[in-house]
Amino acid sequence: MKKIMIVDDEENLVELVKAIFEQEGYEVIPAYSGKECLEKLEKVKPDLILMDMMMPEMTGKETTKKIRENPKTKNLKVAFLTVVRLSEIGKEELKKLNVLDFITKPFDNEDLVRRVKKILGD
């Protein structure tokens, strides 16, 4: 069973996305902050991390940068799931962070599942 980590400070959104992907047969690991994400990555290696950008303490961008700096996690797949518009971050920044997709909220459930399956090769 493939694992997806959802990193978002909005508990309701995490629960919604968790329900969507559990129904699709994935194991879902919730993390409610960048710090919690990094702590959980010490113990578990998800097949994909869905990362919010706007979080208190450590942004999704900062968290992804730390993931890329760690030899144990640098090759993990990361996609942003955020209210931030692509024009606000820029494609070059995404390339630098090796972010595989940029999904904006609000999202269509079927589109989200399709895009995640594409990243995971399912």
Region annotations inferred by a language model:
Residues 10-14, 87:
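Short acidic/polar segment at the start of the alpha1 helix of CheY-like receiver
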Residues 15-23:
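Charged docking surfaces used in two-component/phosphorelay signaling
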Residues 18, 62, 84-103, 110, ...:
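Alpha4 helix (beta4-alpha4-beta5 surface) of REC/receiver domains from two-component response regulators
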Residues 30-39, 60:
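Helix N-cap/capping motif at the beta->alpha junctions
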Residues 39, 61-74:
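Short amphipathic alpha-helix used as the core "switch/output" element in two-component signaling
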Residues 44-50:
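Active-site beta3 strand of CheY-like receiver
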Residues 52, 82:
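Active-site residues of response regulator receiver
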Residues 55:
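Receiver (REC) domain active-site loop signature in two-component systems and cognate sites
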